[in-house]
Amino acid sequence: MEFSPRAAELTTLLESRISNFYTNFQVDEIGRVVSVGDGIARVYGLNEIQAGEMVEFASGVKGIALNLENENVGIVVFGSDTAIKEGDLVKRTGSIVDVPAGKAMLGRVVDALGVPIDGRGALSDHERRRVEVKAPGIIERKSVHEPMQTGLKAVDSLVPIGRGQRELIIGDRQTGKTAIAIDTILNQKQMNSRSTSESETLYCVYVAIGQKRSTVAQLVQILSEANAMEYSILVAATASDPAPLQFLAPYSGCAMGEYFRDNGMHALIIYDDLSKQAVAYRQMSLLLRRPPGREAFPGDVFYLHSRLLERAAKRSDQTGAGSLTALPVIETQAGDVSAYIPTNVIPITDGQICSETELFYRGIRPAINVGLSVSRVGSAAQLKTMKQVCGSSKLELAQYREVAALAQFGSDLDAATQALLNRGARLTEVPKQPQYAPLPIEKQILVIYAAVNGFCDRMPLDRISQYERAILKSIKTELLQSLLEKGGLTNERKMEPDTFLKECALPYTI
């Protein structure tokens, strides 16, 4: 029996099938790994890829395209390259590196890609920001005029820092560079407790580059015990992490800090340290076969740091009046500040705090060399009272260092020289401070006022710290508050502190 389907039925059936037919094609440009090793993958076939674009390997590991060549693309791998092998597929993502940002990040420890590593679960509500963005333009900026207190007498009096400034901390290893940065974070606890609005609070971002994991864990413990983690974010690219993550970590931390800057708030970011970032970038560049320059660093190592530090800024009132203050750390070798990386970063920043091994071992801690340290814009942000009190102390310290060198050779000194040596020794003693014990600015003013105005001149040097403790123990709150008033110290206002300091000095003078 012959089967002859009706034409109408076939037509209807085909039409219904065609109308229900749906394809959701996703077109991805893919390439294949030609070679891989030392964290660098050479990939063939990604002809349309853009510089700085993220890619994904078959193993799930991410990477970023840095070298675009005729035959292949040089990709640095964010993670272990052991799971990647020759012939693996590589897929373009069409996006550049971004990280989470927002207040949900506060109190968390994350890696260079913003993934939490503190074992406290995923991040809650947050936005994502690109790690590489242009720095604010000239019109969007405003000159630095608000103080950023560190809680260290040596810094707040002689090398003041303002919100939106970039102040370099430079020195040999084991001279207390990180201690200065940590004390600054701890000091914001008491500063934030006084703030009356969100626009006064200072949030902190600490970026650990190439440090030991034990050091980072110790830092988390110190900040947690001081309740400082509640306003801090830690970005850690430790020594065991691949070089690309150590290179990326400062930019990731900066993107997190920019969230506060761009939303009318204030943030402080510490890069500890940029020398290790430069070394990681040198390793990547040499493996990508880029031509080496001085000290084998690539030619664009200046741009590596300048584009990062230019993102620290004080925004104008029209753009929200937020700020991002940067404290980059650079490690020198045997005090050589004329090496390549230090000479690159010093002109980018607005001043430097120099720490020295010799001062550290002499017991002057923080070991800050006041002669070499400078703040190019911070004095505009300094409190008027502090400016009045320590105005002449930097000159006196410079004269003291000059005379002290000569006084070693001869004992016949006139009375004026003897008085200068005596005062200089006391001005050197007063800025000494124990670690993790930042002082509020009004207490700093009072202690420095006592030294500058001669209340310590007749005291033995070993009694000055006792005198300082006695001042801080018995001071009245009203007197401290009067030191913060905008008018500065007038002759009438000086009478009360003078009387108080004279009474406190009596038990300690010879």
From Swiss-Prot:
PROSITE patterns: ATPASE_ALPHA_BETA (PS00152). F-type ATPases have 2 components, CF(1) - the catalytic core - and CF(0) - the membrane proton channel. CF(1) has five subunits: alpha(3), beta(3), gamma(1), delta(1), epsilon(1). CF(0) has three main subunits: a, b and c. It is found in: Mitochondrion; Mitochondrion inner membrane. Keywords: ATP synthesis, ATP-binding, CF(1), Hydrogen ion transport, Ion transport, Membrane, Mitochondrion, Mitochondrion inner membrane, Nucleotide-binding, Transport. InterPro entries: ATP_synth_asu-like_sf (IPR023366), ATP_synth_asu_C (IPR000793), ATP_synth_asu_C_sf (IPR038376), ATP_synth_F1_a_nt-bd_dom (IPR033732), ATP_synth_F1_asu (IPR005294), ATPase_a/bsu_AS (IPR020003), ATPase_F1/V1/A1_a/bsu_N (IPR004100), ATPase_F1/V1/A1_a/bsu_N_sf (IPR036121). The gene is ATPA. The keyword Transferase does not apply. It holds the Pfam family ATP-synt_ab_C. Belongs to the ATPase alpha/beta chains family. NCBIfam families: atpA, PRK13343.1. Gene3D superfamilies: 2.40.30.20, ATP synthase alpha/beta chain, C-terminal domain (1.20.150.20), P-loop containing nucleotide triphosphate hydrolases (3.40.50.300). The keyword Membrane applies. ATP binds at G171, D172, R173, Q174, T175, G176, K177, T178. One of its GO terms (cellular component) is proton-transporting ATP synthase complex. This is ATP synthase subunit alpha, mitochondrial. The record marks S373 as: Required for activity. It comes from Helianthus annuus (Common sunflower). Mitochondrial membrane ATP synthase (F(1)F(0) ATP synthase or Complex V) produces ATP from ADP in the presence of a proton gradient across the membrane which is generated by electron transport complexes of the respiratory chain. F-type ATPases consist of two structural domains, F(1) - containing the extramembraneous catalytic core, and F(0) - containing the membrane proton channel, linked together by a central stalk and a peripheral stalk. During catalysis, ATP synthesis in the catalytic domain of F(1) is coupled via a rotary mechanism of the central stalk subunits to proton translocation. GO terms for molecular function: ATP binding; proton-transporting ATP synthase activity, rotational mechanism.
